[in-house]
Amino acid sequence: MPVNLYYTQRVRGFQQVSEKYTSESATFLLRRTKQRCPRCGSTDIVATPLRHRSIRGEPLGCCREVRMEFTVHRLYCHNCLARNLEHIPFLSHPKARISKSLERTILEMRHYASVQDIAKHFRLRWHAIKELEKKHLRKRFSRIQTAHIKAIGIDEIHVGNGKAGDQYLTIIRDLESGAVVHVGDGKGVAALDGALKKLKKSKLRVVTMDMANAYYSWIAEHFPKVSIVFDHFHVIKLMNDKLDHVRRRVMAKMDSAQQKQLKGLRFVFLKNNEDLPENAKRILKNMRGDFQDLGDAYMFKEALRCIYVRAKTSYHARIAFHRWCKLAEETEVPELKTMARTIRDKLDGIVSYWTFRHISNAPMEGFNTKIRLLTRQAYGFRDREYFKLKIFQLPEISCERTI
């Protein structure tokens, strides 16, 4: 067997009969050296020619398109009486059209090159490159080790505008290693189907999430001893939503001139007080004097944020939240009363933020940004399974903002 085909294409068990070159291609005609029964290994067999195969191999120098041609035989073994197709050692499966060596090169290039670029470089179909990577990822992430997992984060991300079940993905990640544990279609309890089997053998102690009742009830049902942490980002976001609702409610009672003025101050109310310029602080002070509900909501928003800044332990945080809720319930602002009820209902999960050393869902939010960037770079994913497999791989690859 010629040495060049062994070291460049990893061809074993075949002898080179002839070769043909053009300006950009090379074709090698191969012949099997010795046939053996794939079941018992006997050489007492009858080989019947079945079909002619042409397989793409790795480029050689200026020959960008390399083909290896050979005849596939059907084998009959006199020893074990078995009938089989002969095994081709340099193919990953019997119907493969490219060699194992070329497959490995393509998968290595996918770390820094797009599917389209690789397809153009090797003169292969885009679909063939995608299916090769999809098969590799499916095999790699078919089983995920979860025995070591102690802390996970659960979050959903909006990924499209299709059917109701296709608009969202629910993602579970190991907060210590960053590995993706589960990717489910949609949001809510239905999206967590399959996650229970994966997490059953884990050493789960803590789960971070937003304040959605669906995730909370699912964890409470299947992992009753696990501590739940409601991410502080979502608590502040919920308060900002209440504040914005007060602003819009107040605007509805104004004339058009006042509405225009207050509409432009939306983000002034949502910003932290210390981040506001002096002129914005003066405008805000005047607005709070003119509209009491809006002023009260802003003050309670800042007070809630200060709890996260100043409280040192879960004990102090619990006292501060109880006081905040008591004062909010004494106001005449319905949005503040609703927020107070929510905090009282979720208080154990909220103060767990201090119990577990300020653990949060921030890594999940950052990971969602990487998913959006991945989607934008690919101009969307038509293959849902391929998209989910790429999410499993995402912690291992770097996403750049350039295409």
Model-derived regions: residue spans:
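Short, conserved DNA-binding cores of transcription-related domains
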Residues: 1-88
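Short, conserved catalytic/metal-binding motifs centered on acidic residues
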Residues: 28, 77, 118, 152-157, ...
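Acidic, glycine-enriched active-site microenvironments
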Residues: 94-104, 116, 176, 182, ...
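RNase H-like nuclease fold core
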Residues: 134-218
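Conserved beta-strand -> loop -> alpha-helix junction used to position metal-binding or nucleic-acid-contacting
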Residues: 210-213, 220-259, 264, 365
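Helix-loop elements that line ligand-binding/catalytic pockets
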Residues: 265-332
